[in-house]
Amino acid sequence: MTRKQKRLAIIGGGVGFLTAAVLLVMFAFSQAVAYFYVPGDLTKADVAPGTRIRLGGLVEAGSVKRGEGRTITFKVTDTLATVPVTYTGILPDLFREGQGVVAEGAFVGGSPVFVADTVLAKHDETYMPKDVADRLKAQGVTLGGEENIR
């Protein structure tokens, strides 16, 4: 091989390696991404069963039911729509009815029940999208710290 051919082989190998690395990173990120939805968005969104998403909203008053063992069912609402959620595990201390929550999981087997494997309780409702805050205010729900609503 001449020097020119060696250089081309090294450059070609480097480009091939870089392309493979970029494709691998893109594939890994596409598998790890969980899009955020509120219940009202799910009626418009086409979420395939088994697709991991984050579901956020308020825990509907009177909806928390404790099942066998550590299984808990509750409903997440954004005042436009409500989604039933099942979670098996220990809930965060701040979890309660009327409080903000983000559940991560998936709809399994075409069921309308969201199966969560992670539940995060929001300690403060002051940081929420303005359209959600406006809907809550229109229904008479009072919010603290309204100067922080975006």
Swiss-Prot record:
SUPFAM superfamilies: Heme chaperone CcmE. This is Cytochrome c-type biogenesis protein CcmE. The keyword Transport does not apply. HAMAP family: CcmE. It is found in: Cell inner membrane. The gene is ccmE. It comes from Sinorhizobium medicae (strain WSM419) (Ensifer medicae). Belongs to the CcmE/CycJ family. The keyword Translocase does not apply.
